[in-house]
Amino acid sequence: MKLIMKTKFKTGQYICIKWRPVESLIPTPLGFMYSSKNESTYGVWKIEPYKFGGIDYKMRLVPVGESAKIFFPMDRYTSDYSDLPDEMIFDDQSLAEKFVKEFLID
């Protein structure tokens, strides 16, 4: 997996991206695993600094608001979102949530 190193946004901002919602939690001896739905949907994610096990991942995506009910945080992910349009990057959570509701979700 590729870690985010260079982005056009910074921690504390909110981005609107498409991801697969959690379908169910599966208990395991090491904690929980989850299965995802096959269809992706848009959500609002806050960009937070993240360091774990001595590895600096630069940032972590944490779902907020309504998105927190259907998504799990992403510590590692495969895209740097460098092609994310500026219109999908917000400094205010309520504006990001309004944008998703009005323009991205049917």
Labelled PLM ranges:
Residues 1-14:
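Mixed-charge, Lys/Arg-rich low-complexity intrinsically disordered regions
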Residues 7, 29, 34-37, 65, ...:
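Generic low-complexity, intrinsically disordered sequence content enriched
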